[in-house]
Amino acid sequence: MKKILLLTFLSFLLISCGSSKSSSSSKTTKVERTSKSNSYKKTESIISYAKTFKGTRYKFGGTTKKGMDCSGLVYTSFLKEKISLPRVSRDMAKKGKRLSKDKISKGDLVFFKTNKNKNVINHVGLVVESKRGNILFIHSSSSRGVIVSSLDEKYWRNAFVEGRRVL
């Protein structure tokens, strides 16, 4: 029995932050359309708030400074601007406008498939900078907590699925 529990626990750690607290199906998701100047202000505010979590340890299902998973970071950061997104990365990937890599800009979301055994989006990051094709995003890594990474890093380049614009 202990071996089964240990294997189950290790499995959860290995799948990064792909799933977490399920969002209620009775809740509606509100993605707000805004003017360009208002959108810019909201984008800056969301990114600024997300950066306050840098260094926060990874915690499956976490949404606070005590621990944060990838979708929790994005969910909490957007909620600061009263923008409600689904709580799970694979559901977030259904919102907004799909973007090719060359159209991704600051404030967009980037989605990944990091579990080689499952063909499902299980990781999300928030783009904090996009200059000359170099895309930097903040996310919560299961091994390093909340950090900023580059889409040019081999691991993330290979796991990348799509970008989405929700603002």
Go through the PLM ranges and name each one.
Residues 18-27, 33-38, 127-167:
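Aromatic- and glycine-rich peptidoglycan recognition patches
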Residues 34-37, 57-106:
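Catalytic cysteine-centered active-site loop
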Residues 104, 117, 131-133:
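Short strand-connecting beta-turns/loops that link adjacent beta-strands
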Residues 43-51, 71-75, 104, 160:
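Extracytoplasmic/secreted envelope proteins and their assembly/folding machinery
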Residues 117-124:
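Short, Lys/Arg- and Gly-enriched loop/turn segments at beta-strand edges
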Residues 2-8, 21:
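Sec-dependent signal peptide recognition
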Residues 13-16:
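C-terminal motif of bacterial Sec signal peptides marking the signal peptidase cleavage site
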